[in-house]
């Protein structure tokens, strides 16, 4: 479920957000409802977090991104968080991989399957999910396979 630019100025309360999401999920009759929120502790984010079965967030293996991830893991350690390393080069940066391990060590936060870097993602013109095409463009096939692995991981995690 995407957000809207007007949402920032007209945010419902945490409880109203949670109630609305639960109501909509029931009306839609779907197994999954994915809520895309923006970073930060807003009422909308906190409402979505309060009812989430799993909180999936991508983590590029870069120093500044890991700084933010470390802060987020401390703040959200009580939530069912799964971190997905994203834009991972063919040879993952060892220091950042070790740091990610240290960030989650001693917390219930899990690290899921990685998504490989693919230049084609950044230059792609189609406005549809990469996994919607069967098969996706050759350059995107490793990314599509990884996204399917993430989906399977999340399904198993929340079962």
What are these regions (language model features)?
Residues 1-31:
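P-loop/Walker-type NTP enzyme "switch/lid" segment
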Residues 3, 36, 55-60, 83-87:
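Conserved beta-strand segments of the P-loop GTPase G domain that flank and frequently precede/overlap
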Residues 12-19, 71-92:
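P-loop/Walker A phosphate-binding loop and immediately adjacent motor/lid segment at beta-alpha junctions
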Residues 28-44:
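Glycine-rich phosphate-binding loop used to anchor ATP phosphates in small-molecule kinases
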Residues 40-63:
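Inter-motif core of Ras-like GTPase G domains
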Residues 50, 74-79, 104-105:
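Short, conserved loop/helix-junction motifs that constitute active-site signature segments
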Residues 87-135, 147-149:
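Beta-strand-loop-alpha "switch" segments that mediate conformational coupling across diverse proteins
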Residues 134-159:
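Histidine-centered active-site loop/cap adjacent to the catalytic His
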């Amino acid at each position: 479920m995407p957000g809207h630019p007007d949402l920032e100025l007209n945010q419902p309360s945490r409880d109203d957000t949670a109630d609305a999401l639960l109501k909509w999920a029931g009306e839609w009759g779907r197994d999954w409802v994915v809520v895309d929120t923006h970073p930060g502790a807003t009422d909308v984010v906190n409402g979505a977090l309060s009812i989430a079965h799993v909180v999936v967030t991508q983590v590029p293996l870069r120093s500044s991104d890991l700084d933010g991830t470390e802060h987020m893991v401390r703040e959200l350690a009580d939530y069912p968080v799964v971190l997905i390393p994203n834009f991972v080069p063919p040879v993952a940066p060892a220091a950042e991989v070790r740091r990610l391990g240290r960030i989650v060590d001693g917390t219930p936060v899990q690290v899921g399957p990685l998504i490989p870097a693919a230049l084609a993602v950044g230059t792609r013109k189609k406005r549809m999910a990469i996994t919607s095409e069967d098969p996706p463009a050759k350059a995107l096939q490793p990314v599509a396979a990884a996204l399917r692995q993430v989906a399977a991981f999340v399904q198993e995690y929340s079962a």
